């Protein structure tokens, strides 16, 4: 009844429902489709609109190129276009004052958006607090559900960035189930993975990629955690400057800072240790509370837990692999010093160098298999330089 009741001379319109397109008289073929009670009720000269649902696009007058599907969808926009609203109440308050190019799909998706533009909002209640925010992407149930006036965020996943309302363009990216769900004013974070960075509130400049990566840190930043549960327990109380890459890399680190951990289960026992470098599967795998060690290579320094700042350097496959409480050792080469446990102040460079010494110290072995059989169990004070140098020495000093 009263559908398309004003149009006089032009066509290519479809109006189905009480007062659908009632006031349209475009002066040309309008190519509008309105289906539903008072759908497109006030459209006068607007064209190329598709409006389906009771009261869908019912405030449109001259707006063009809009799609509104669902009860009250796009219910306030009058003179502009380029919007897609699919879902009951989606974009129901939008009236941007210009072509807005918003996309909202889902029940009440973007329902509070008034003048914000260029947003993509998909999922029930996704971006439902946005008013003037621009250039956001929110995909998932209640994704980006608190941000109102700012933009340039990407939230993809159930509850992703749900609490964010930074007070400025935040440039956060969160992809995954509840990724970054508690961030409120934190900015410049990149979070990808289920529960990645899900405790962050005001923390900024973090990168967390992987399931439960960086999932305890709340208020601080400048950490990089890449891998399943990487830096899972970290909550330093200050900017941490930790880098952990690998499965469970640095997973138990709590308040340690300035660590670089690369490799599956590398540095996975560290809690409060600082200034360590562990690169390789299992590297520095037992140290918890201390630092100043460098372990590069599979299982390098894997059993070290010195009880003090270690100042050990081990580079090579299984270099220093048996060391427990030794200090101030420099071991470079595969299997160098691989029997050392409590020995200190040793230098071994070359494949298999100082390969039998366990508790002794103050030896210098440079060369393949140099001092390979030496095991003095005291301060050996031996110096051997060259291929196989001192290879026959066992207990000599």
Regions found by a protein language model. Name each.
Residues 1-397:
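Glycine- and small/polar-enriched repetitive beta-structure motifs of secreted/surface proteins
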């Amino acid at each position: 009844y009263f559908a398309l009741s004003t149009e006089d001379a032009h066509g290519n319109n479809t109006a189905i429902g009480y007062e659908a397109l009632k006031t349209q008289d475009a002066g040309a073929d309008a190519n509008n489709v309105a289906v539903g009670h008072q759908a497109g009720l006030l459209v006068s000269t607007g064209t190329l609109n598709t409006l389906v649902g009771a009261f869908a696009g019912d405030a449109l007058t001259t707006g063009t190129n809009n799609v509104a599907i669902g009860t009250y969808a796009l219910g306030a926009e009058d003179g502009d276009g380029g919007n897609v609203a699919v879902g009951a109440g989606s974009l129901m308050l939008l009236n941007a004052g210009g072509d807005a190019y918003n996309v909202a799909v889902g029940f009440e998706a973007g329902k509070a958006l008034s003048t914000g533009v260029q947003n993509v909002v998909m999922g029930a209640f996704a971006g439902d607090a946005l008013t003037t925010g621009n250039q956001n992407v929110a995909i998932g149930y209640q994704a980006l559900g608190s941000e109102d006036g700012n933009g340039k965020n990407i939230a993809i996943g159930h509850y992703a960035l749900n609490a964010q309302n930074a007070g400025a363009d935040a440039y956060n990216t969160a992809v995954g189930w509840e990724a970054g769900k508690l961030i409120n004013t934190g900015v410049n974070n990149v979070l990808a993975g289920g529960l990645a960075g899900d405790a962050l509130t005001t923390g900024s400049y973090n990168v967390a990629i992987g399931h439960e990566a960086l999932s305890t840190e709340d208020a601080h930043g400048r950490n990089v955690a890449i891998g399943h549960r990487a830096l899972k327990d970290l909550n330093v109380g200050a900017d941490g400057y930790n880098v952990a890459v690998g499965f469970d890399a640095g997973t138990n680190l709590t308040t340690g800072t300035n660590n670089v951990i690369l490799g599956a289960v590398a540095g996975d026992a560290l809690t409060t240790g600082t200034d360590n470098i562990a690169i390789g599967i299992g590297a520095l795998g037992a140290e918890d509370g201390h630092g100043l060690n460098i372990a590069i290579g599979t299982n390098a320094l894997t059993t070290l837990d010195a009880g003090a700042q270690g100042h050990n350097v081990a580079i090579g496959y299984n270099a220093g692999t048996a060391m427990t409480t030794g200090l101030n050792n420099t071991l470079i080469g595969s299997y160098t010093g691989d029997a050392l446990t409590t020995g200190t102040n040793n230098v071994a460079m070359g494949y298999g160098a100082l390969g039998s010494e366990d508790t002794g110290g103050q030896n210098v072995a440079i060369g393949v298999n140099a001092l390979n059989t030496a095991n003095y169990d005291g301060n050996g004070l031996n110096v051997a330089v060259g291929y196989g140098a001192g290879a026959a020495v066992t207990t000599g000093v």
